[in-house]
């Protein structure tokens, strides 16, 4: 007798047992098999690149600063009439008359008011000044600080309690007989005292604050905006001031928080959609600040 195939069934299809069966709508399969074209449907041209983080672009607001202490000029000088004491000196510009107050071991209070914490040991001094540029300030003889009156522990304790070793307050004096109510405009300079490799104390500015029209501002350096003059009288800011991207337009945009002024506003607006890294230091960028600088001719 021959072989009989009952029910008209087809011979078994010998497939690779390692591959999943073809989809069958009548099969009671629990679960889903991955599609070989699933990733191609999502990324037809390969893996999608992550989007660049949006960087905010802002324009700077000009604030009038009537008094400016040049922090790079601040130093301690020996008191020739009082051996062992040191006097604070610095250079400043003032467009209006005002007063300068020097405090030792002072902390900042409300509305940028300074509070002397050791007034009995280190009395504060105050002097008035007229308006003018490149004025030099130096404490009067006998009013300086004697380092033998303090210890290393005093300096460390001050740092841990938000007390600055030295604080300089440059304050505007009202030109009329009826000064405005509230705290007058002022600039506060906070200084710490540190020993150098010779064991001598040096003064170092750590913070400068502006109080203008009831608002508090912290001053920060911007790299690439300084106006310097070389030995030949040439403005160094005129050389190499071009945008580092297009190499043609002047720099007017600062990268924050690294504070590199390195781009023009046009390149900055385009670059913020392509990368969020500073072109100079490659640090992440939070904001772009457009600053208009007016370089007036020096007299």
Swiss-Prot record:
Pfam family, one: zf-C3HC4_3
Enzyme nomenclature, EC number: 2.3.2.27
Chain positions covered by the region annotation DAR2 domain: 90-208
Keyword annotations of the record: Lipoprotein, Metal-binding, Myristate, Transferase, Ubl conjugation pathway, Zinc, Zinc-finger
Any GO BP: protein ubiquitination
GO molecular function per UniProt: ubiquitin protein ligase activity; ubiquitin-protein transferase activity; zinc ion binding
Zinc finger (RING-type): 243-282
InterPro entries per UniProt: LOG2-like_mRING_C3HC5 (IPR045195), MGRN1/RNF157-like (IPR045194), Znf_RING (IPR001841), Znf_RING/FYVE/PHD (IPR013083)
Catalytic activity of the protein: S-ubiquitinyl-[E2 ubiquitin-conjugating enzyme]-L-cysteine + [acceptor protein]-L-lysine = [E2 ubiquitin-conjugating enzyme]-L-cysteine + N(6)-ubiquitinyl-[acceptor protein]-L-lysine
Stretches the record annotates as Disordered: 1-33
Highest taxon, organism lineage: Eukaryota
CDD domains referenced in this protein's UniProt entry, alphabetically: mRING-HC-C3HC5_MGRN1-like
Pathway the protein acts in: Protein modification; protein ubiquitination
SUPFAM superfamilies to which the protein is assigned, alphabetical: RING/U-box (SSF57850)
EC class (word): transferase
Lipid-binding residues (covalent, N-myristoyl glycine): 2
Disulfide partners: none
Domain remarks in the Swiss-Prot or TrEMBL record: The RING-type zinc finger domain mediates binding to an E2 ubiquitin-conjugating enzyme.
Cited function: Acts as an E3 ubiquitin-protein ligase, or as part of E3 complex, which accepts ubiquitin from specific E2 ubiquitin-conjugating enzymes and then transfers it to substrates (in vitro).
Record-stated family: Belongs to the RING-type zinc finger family. LOG2 subfamily.
Descriptive protein name: Probable E3 ubiquitin-protein ligase LUL2
Organism: Arabidopsis thaliana (Mouse-ear cress)
Gene name of the encoded protein: LUL2
